[in-house]
Amino acid sequence: MKKAIIGRKVGMTQIFDEKGKVIPVTVVEAGPCVVVQKKTLENDGYEAIQVGFDEIREKLANKPRKGHFAKAGATLRRTLKEFRLDDISQYEVGNEIKADVFGAGDKVDVSAVSKGKGFQGSIKRWNQQRGPMTHGSKFHRAPGSMGASSDPSRTFKNKRMPGHMGSVNTTVLNLEVVKVIAEKNLILIKGGIPGPNKGTVVIKDTVRA
């Protein structure tokens, strides 16, 4: 059965396995999330659950959001996400989803908005090669040719050029859950995940299982 939860990236640390080997892990505060709405085949044409995360004060929500949460009988949340799961019959509006839906050894996909790097050149942004730094060269970190001359007389779409780097939704696949601390709603995931500390992350069962 597929599982999913919304969380907040706390940061990275390291733990030791039973053989004393160091394992780098990312700590995620996962949930508690509340089921705000159920989408059904009859009403919506597909089955899914809508989940809210991160409680907020009433003054931070507009009237439509307040009404949406009041209908569900749930407290106001900052983040809303929709998950298409195999079987939504076990979920009811108002139910809580906590970190213990996952267990040690589970394989997950983690999605988050990557760190923004601002405007960057093509060397940093696309890992292009630079020119010679000495021997009379005047070409160092410039992007180089944009394309051919009279034919086609334009730069092709998607040409790798300098521009805004980062701040895009990124997914890392097939990461391992090392440990779940249910009483603190913490999930420890092996390796790094996208985004800054305190950023919102979505954890789902991996598609590569």
Curated annotation (Swiss-Prot):
The organism's place on the tree of life at top rank: Bacteria
Record region (Disordered): 128-154
Gene Ontology biological process terms from the UniProt entry: translation
GO molecular function annotation: rRNA binding; structural constituent of ribosome
PROSITE patterns noted in UniProt: RIBOSOMAL_L3
SUPFAM superfamilies, A to Z: Translation proteins (SSF50447)
Alphabetical list of InterPro entries matching this protein: Ribosomal_uL3, Ribosomal_uL3_bac/org-type, Ribosomal_uL3_CS, Transl_B-barrel_sf
Keywords: Ribonucleoprotein, Ribosomal protein, RNA-binding, rRNA-binding
Keyword Ribosomal protein belongs to the record: yes
A Pfam family the protein falls into: Ribosomal_L3
Membrane among keywords: no
GO cellular component annotations of the record: cytosolic large ribosomal subunit
Function: One of the primary rRNA binding proteins, it binds directly near the 3'-end of the 23S rRNA, where it nucleates assembly of the 50S subunit.
Subunit note: Part of the 50S ribosomal subunit. Forms a cluster with proteins L14 and L19.
Family: Belongs to the universal ribosomal protein uL3 family.
NCBIfam families hit by this protein: L3_bact
Name the record gives this protein: Large ribosomal subunit protein uL3
Native species: Clostridium beijerinckii (strain ATCC 51743 / NCIMB 8052)
Gene this chain is encoded by: rplC
